[in-house]
Amino acid sequence: MEETYTDSLDPEKLLQCPYDKNHQIRACRFPYHLIKCRKNHPDVASKLATCPFNARHQVPRAEISHHISSCDDRSCIEQDVVNQTRSLRQETLAESTWQCPPCDEDWDKDLWEQTSTPFVWGTTHYSDNNSPASNIVTEHKNNLASGMRVPKSLPYVLPWKNNGNAQ
């Protein structure tokens, strides 16, 4: 059965389904077919085991240990593990020498030294004092036309407000 998996790089290659020998499936669709066919053939699926290195490999349960020891995809996984452990060792050895630069900013001091007043929508500024608190006058402007008023409620009823009745 392993001969059908040797050229898995060709997406158009036909592979035989391990659950139904009459099924010839293109390699690019094979994983999807395996999932569907496994559900349709639970009796055959219970006799087969999935290779831990390649889910496309479905082998009889009695032969899984032999397949694991001789699987071609095992070398790819082992090489990935070796590369990851090497990179982790190199990362732990190389300690960072970066240091935070000294901070010479003082935002509070800059705020008091600021000559222009901050912009606040809907307010006017009258004072010459540079204190930020004294620059803002609490005079609210009404920009609506003389015949218009602000609505007293939202244009829709909120779900938790049911005409003043508690639920």
Curated annotation (Swiss-Prot):
Transmembrane segments: none
GO molecular function: tRNA binding; zinc ion binding
Chain residues that bind Zn(2+) 1: 17, 23, 33, 37
Keyword Secreted attributed: no
GO biological process, one term: secondary piRNA processing
Coiled coil, from the record: none
Cellular component GO terms held in the UniProt record: piP-body
Zn finger region (CHHC U11-48K-type): 14-41, 48-75
Keyword Transmembrane helix: no
Biological role stated in the UniProt entry: Required for spermatogenesis and is involved in the suppression of retrotransposon transcription in male germ cells.
Stated family: Belongs to the UPF0224 (FAM112) family.
Protein name: Gametocyte-specific factor 1
Organism: Homo sapiens (Human)
Taxonomic lineage from the root: Eukaryota, Metazoa, Chordata, Craniata, Vertebrata
